[in-house]
C-alpha cells in the first residue's frame, strides 16, 4: 500500500553567494534540483556545488518552492 506522503522529495538548491549579491551586477543565480530523503535529513540541505556565475565551489542551500 502507498503511504500518504512520499519519503523522497524534490528540493531546489540555490547558491548563497549569488543570492546575497543579486542586487549587484550578477549574471544570474545558480540553482540545482535534487532529491532528499525526509527521514534521514529532516533539516534543510546544504551542499558544496559548482557555481558557474561565481566560477567556483560555493555553499548551496535548500530553498522553498
Curated annotation (Swiss-Prot):
GO terms for molecular function: structural constituent of ribosome. GO terms for biological process: translation. InterPro entries: Ribosomal_bL33 (IPR001705), Ribosomal_bL33_CS (IPR018264), Ribosomal_bL33_sf (IPR038584), Ribosomal_zn-bd (IPR011332). One of its GO terms (cellular component) is ribosome. Pfam families: Ribosomal_L33. SUPFAM superfamilies: Zn-binding ribosomal proteins. The keyword Ribosomal protein applies. Keywords: Chloroplast, Plastid, Ribonucleoprotein, Ribosomal protein. The keyword Chloroplast applies. Gene3D superfamilies: Ribosomal protein L33. It is found in: Plastid, Chloroplast. Belongs to the bacterial ribosomal protein bL33 family. This is Large ribosomal subunit protein bL33c. It comes from Zygnema circumcarinatum. The lineage of its organism: Eukaryota, Viridiplantae, Streptophyta, Zygnematophyceae, Zygnematophycidae. The gene is rpl33.
Amino acid at each position: 500500500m502507498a503511504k500518504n506522503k512520499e519519503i523522497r522529495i524534490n528540493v531546489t538548491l540555490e547558491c548563497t553567494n549569488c543570492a546575497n549579491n543579486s542586487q549587484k551586477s550578477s549574471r544570474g543565480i545558480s540553482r540545482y534540483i535534487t532529491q532528499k530523503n525526509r527521514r534521514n535529513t529532516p533539516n534543510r540541505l546544504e551542499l558544496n556545488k559548482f557555481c558557474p556565475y561565481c566560477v567556483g565551489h560555493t555553499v548551496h542551500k535548500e530553498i522553498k518552492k
